């Protein structure tokens, strides 16, 4: 045996908590404490093995250093195929690293010395689930799973083929879990914790097989780690830190019956780490000795807090070798080379030691074929042989399940082939660019250097940056491995503002397609666009050209796009004035800050046709010429309303108990002593324009009182559609308008609603509304009118019937200071109102009631954690009205789940309730794609958590009756989707868990019977 303690392997005096040798033996990794962070270092193995390589300066010793962990790294482990490195630390994270093929070394960031990263390793995935320090990680024998344990008392099983998917979370320990080891045949995983127990879990169903406590009753939680190990033949599990007659031991646990009759004794302090040699040995046959085959045996290394290392052979009663005082502090980790003749040991004192054995000392190692034969003869064949994330050692009971697995295997093979074909051109392109090698490119770049001469004749070369060239093997960007579904709705909201056409009159300019700001510059003053939007061309107080007015209609677009971040402009278009405005919360807050700007006083304008006064809801309404002097007086008193406003409000038919701030530009609910609701109404403008769709050639123009016939003034409506134009004349001034590709509707002063077809044909006689219009919207062939009396109506113009008739908002606006911040009419005619308290309601015509579909303060959304059930990151994100209503809430809820520590049962219940709410809300909104999206996530969660009863109920509802019956009330479709087609999509999810193979088979067979019929 040879012993070496290389001084060049160190963490600058900081502790090294873990070490692991790469399967190919060319490198090894260490993990521990760095400078203000955790540190993972990959070292070159040849300088450790040969003295001449250590002295050769051309052979690098350090290959790469990664300081991405925010806190100390407790464990590093290579995958069995050597492609990945997993590291876990005190920052509660597990990072999975993969080599990236950069050319040339790079300096270690932040290093004062000239350290260079010869190899480039990038973070492939970051696994977040633990709420405490990660103490140990372990790859399954065939790299299908990655297990991690933590001081949060849990063990998490990750799907190594589909990070960051969680297969299962093992709960049962009542103390800090400090060590993990896999059964070499893949049937069990064992964990050791400070609760004086080792628990063995079945990988078949991730349930507890046995709990071993007796050898650990006298133990205390004095060790930093408890690294236990399973023998390569699978017969023995050896624990760390056990006690026998008050003496520290390493307990030997037999697989057969989990008996604890033997142990490794001799260490003076607690055992911290046990590591079996990966090879199975047999005694070396000497020349002339008996040809009788010897019994195979295993080799085990034991490290302790007494700073000593012992190496044992299971065929001997005493240790093969004991090395005392090998380090200054406790031994933390041990790793064997793949050939079984070398061993690396690390210590808390920040150093490592390498022991090199010979075959004469350990014996002849068995070949891999002989080792597999031992496994097969002892345990039989196992599903663990496959790389599928299935449950090993589970009997497949029927051919349908077997066929399903084979189809999945073929599908994955096809995906890998396509991926390989896509990566091949990348590698070729990286190695050769335009026929030149990368080295030629570098030389050509150096030839292009810029050289100048200074005044004194000296040369000066301008520095030229030569970027690193990646030869491929790209990996996911750092901190970007968790899908954020909430980002898409947010981006859609911000991108929809280009679907607006700005109101025009003779002195205004047009703007369409560009992204508008909420604030426009007028002269030298900065004012909100809405503030200057409604000034008429005849306003004598305006010294600069009138700014474009932000008035648009509700175009016919997808329901999810109907609510966007520029909803203020859209709703003002439907109401005909900036007086009725709907802002998202961000815009509201921005406008609140400008509450003291000029011309921000509330204006109350008396209607010329109705006796009901208008309630102020904007910073400035349309001005008449005679009011210019009054405006100058108002600017001197910025905190008080005009006397005229006070007089008009005092004679209002409803006695106002509260009026919301007019700077908030929201639909304001005014509560009264008689509980009568009043919503703000728009004031007629001289002219305005609104766009019908994203096509800028489709828009309508409104001009009030442009013609005089017999002493009566008429208003004109013009519609421009695909190069064609039609006109309509109305006898009253138009106060609000809305339109889509199918329908154009306008509301006039005399409470009349006129509806026209896309070609200009009047569909109905003027509809008399019960009170003046407050908000008018149109989507497809549906028209929604919200009146000043807080009554909502929705008509189906195509079928000429009413869907919702004068439904009161009283149940929604019963609280104080509640306002309507957003409105939405889906493409199926479902109205949705979003209130200032963050709650959103929709009205169901079938139930004749309001339903809560979203709540920003919902604790379920904040605590639910269903990330492992989300579609992959490259999947098309779900879009629809529910996603737009909730906006970024769902993303915030998933991120907040990491900040809350709660019992698993509580989190499971909250996640279940949240997903069921999402499915029900999508169904209420009649959003078919969102219903399918959330149903699949819900089903995946049921499969992951093992809720068979609810899963069966979902499947039964989708399957329906197998035999036809005249009195059956079952509907074969839901929201236009075939239920049995949805069931076909659910079955592959169910098939992922072999515990549900009978459920899978049951419904698969019934679908086959129905198909044959």
Curated annotation (Swiss-Prot):
Basic and acidic residues bias: start-end ranges: 558-572, 589-604, 624-634
Repeat region (WD), residues: 11-53, 68-107, 129-168, 172-211, 220-263, 266-322, 326-367
Any one GO BP annotation for this protein: DNA-templated transcription
Biased composition (Polar residues): 535-553, 573-587
Pfam families named in the record: Beta-prop_CAF1B_HIR1 (PF24105), Hira (PF07569)
Family affiliation: Belongs to the WD repeat HIR1 family.
PANTHER family found in the cross-reference section: MEMBER OF THE HIR1 FAMILY OF WD-REPEAT PROTEINS (PTHR13831), PROTEIN HIRA (PTHR13831:SF0)
Record-given protein name: Protein HIRA
Gene: hira
């Amino acid at each position: 045996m040879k012993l070496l303690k290389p001084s060049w392997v160190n963490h600058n005096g900081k502790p090294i908590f873990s070490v692991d040798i790469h399967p190919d033996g060319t490198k090894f990794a260490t993990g521990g404490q760095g400078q203000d962070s955790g540190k993972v270092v990959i070292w070159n193995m040849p300088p450790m093995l040969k003295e001449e390589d250590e002295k050769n300066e051309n052979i690098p010793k350090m290959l790469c250093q990664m300081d991405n962990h925010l806190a100390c790294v407790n464990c590093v482990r290579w995958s069995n195929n050597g492609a990945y490195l997993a590291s876990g630390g005190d920052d509660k994270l597990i990072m999975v690293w993969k080599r990236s093929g950069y050319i040339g070394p790079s300096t270690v960031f932040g290093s004062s010395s000239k350290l260079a990263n010869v190899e480039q390793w990038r973070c492939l995935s970051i696994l977040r689930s633990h709420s405490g320090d990660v103490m140990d990680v372990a790859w399954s024998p065939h790299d299908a799973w990655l297990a991690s344990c933590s001081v949060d008392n849990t063990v998490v099983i990750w799907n190594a083929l589909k990070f960051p998917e969680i297969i299962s979370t093992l709960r049962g320990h009542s103390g800090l879990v400090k060590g993990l080891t896999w059964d070499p045949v893949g049937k069990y995983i064992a964990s050791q914790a400070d609760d004086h127990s080792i628990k063995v879990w079945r990988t078949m169903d991730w349930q507890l097989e046995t709990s071993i406590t007796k050898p650990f009753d006298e133990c205390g939680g004095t060790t930093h780690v408890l690294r236990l190990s399973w023998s390569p033949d699978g017969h023995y599990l050896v624990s760390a830190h056990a006690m026998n007659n008050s003496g520290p031991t390493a307990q030997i646990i037999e697989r057969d019956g989990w008996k604890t009759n033997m142990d490794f004794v001799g260490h003076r302090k607690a055992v911290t780490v046990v590591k079996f040699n990966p090879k199975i040995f047999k005694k070396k046959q000497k020349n002339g000795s008996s040809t009788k085959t010897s019994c195979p045996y295993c080799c085990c290394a034991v490290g302790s807090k007494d700073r000593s290392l012992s190496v044992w052979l299971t065929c001997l009663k005493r240790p093969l070798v004991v090395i005392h005082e090998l380090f200054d502090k406790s031994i933390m980790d041990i790793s064997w080379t793949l050939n079984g003749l070398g061993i690396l040991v690390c210590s808390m004192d920040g150093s490592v030691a390498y022991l090199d054995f010979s075959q004469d000392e350990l014996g002849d190692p068995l070949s891999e074929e002989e080792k597999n034969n031992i496994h097969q003869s002892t345990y039989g064949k196992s599903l663990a042989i496959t790389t599928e994330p299935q449950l090993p050692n589970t009997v497949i009971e029927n051919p349908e399940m077997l066929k399903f697995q084979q189809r999945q295997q073929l599908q994955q093979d096809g995906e890998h082939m396509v991926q390989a074909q896509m990566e091949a051109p990348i590698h070729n392109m990286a190695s050769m660019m335009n026929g030149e090698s990368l080295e030629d490119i570098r030389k050509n770049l150096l030839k292009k250097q810029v050289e100048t001469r200074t005044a004194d004749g000296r040369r000066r070369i301008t520095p030229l940056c030569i970027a690193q060239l990646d030869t491929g093997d790209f990996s996911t960007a750092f901190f970007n491995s968790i899908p954020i579904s909430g980002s898409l709705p947010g981006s859609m909201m911000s991108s929809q503002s280009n679907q607006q056409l700005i109101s025009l009159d003779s002195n205004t300019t047009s703007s369409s397609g560009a992204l508008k700001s909420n604030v426009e510059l007028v002269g030298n003053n900065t004012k909100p666009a809405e503030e200057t939007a409604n000034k008429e061309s005849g306003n004598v107080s305006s010294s600069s050209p009138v700014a474009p007015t932000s008035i648009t209609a509700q175009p016919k677009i997808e329901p999810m796009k109907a609510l966007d971040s520029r909803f203020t402009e859209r709703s003002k278009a439907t109401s005909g004035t900036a007086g009725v405005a709907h802002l998202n919360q961000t815009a509201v807050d921005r406008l609140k800050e400008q509450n003291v700007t000029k011309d921000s006083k509330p204006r109350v304008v008396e209607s010329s046709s109705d006796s009901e006064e208008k309630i102020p809801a904007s910073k400035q309404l349309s001005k008449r010429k005679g009011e210019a002097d009054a405006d100058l007086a108002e600017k001197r008193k910025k905190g008080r309303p005009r006397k005229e406003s006070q007089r008009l409000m005092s004679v209002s038919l409803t006695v106002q108990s509260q009026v919301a701030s007019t700077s908030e530009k929201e639909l304001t609910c005014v509560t009264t002593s008689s509980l009568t609701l009043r919503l703000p109404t728009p004031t007629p403008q001289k002219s305005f324009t609104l766009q019908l769709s994203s096509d800028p050639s489709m828009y309508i123009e409104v001009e009030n009182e442009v013609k005089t016939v017999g002493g009566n003034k008429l208003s004109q409506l013009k519609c421009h559609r695909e190069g064609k134009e039609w006109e309509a004349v109305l006898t009253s001034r138009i106060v609000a308008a809305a339109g889509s590709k199918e329908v154009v509707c306008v509301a006039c002063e005399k409470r009349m609603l006129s509806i026209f077809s896309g070609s200009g044909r009047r569909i109905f006689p003027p509809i008399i509304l019960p009170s003046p219009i407050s908000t008018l919207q149109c989507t497809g062939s549906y028209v929604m009118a919200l009146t000043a009396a807080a009554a909502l109506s929705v008509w189906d113009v195509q079928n000429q019937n009413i869907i919702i008739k004068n439904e009161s908002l009283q149940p929604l606006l019963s609280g104080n200071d509640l306002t309507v911040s957003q409105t939405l009419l889906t493409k199926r005619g479902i109205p949705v109102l979003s209130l200032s308290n963050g709650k959103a309601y929709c009205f169901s015509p079938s139930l004749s009631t309001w339903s809560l579909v979203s709540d920003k303060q919902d604790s379920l959304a904040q605590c639910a954690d269903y990330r492992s059930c989300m579609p992959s990151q490259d999947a098309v994100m779900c879009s629809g009205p529910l996603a737009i209503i909730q906006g970024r809430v769902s993303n915030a809820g998933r991120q907040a789940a990491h900040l809350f520590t709660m019992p698993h049962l509580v989190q499971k219940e909250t996640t279940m309730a949240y997903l069921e709410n999402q499915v029900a809300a999508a169904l209420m909104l009649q959003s078919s794609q969102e219903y399918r999206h959330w149903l699949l996530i819900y089903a995946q969660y049921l499969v992951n958590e093992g809720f068979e009863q609810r899963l069966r109920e979902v499947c039964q509802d989708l399957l329906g009756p197998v035999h036809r019956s005249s009195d059956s009330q079952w509907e074969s479709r839901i929201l236009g989707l075939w239920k049995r087609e949805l069931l076909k999509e659910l079955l592959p999810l169910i098939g992922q868990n072999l515990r549900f193979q009978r459920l899978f088979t049951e419904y698969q067979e019934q679908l086959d019977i129905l198909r044959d019929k």
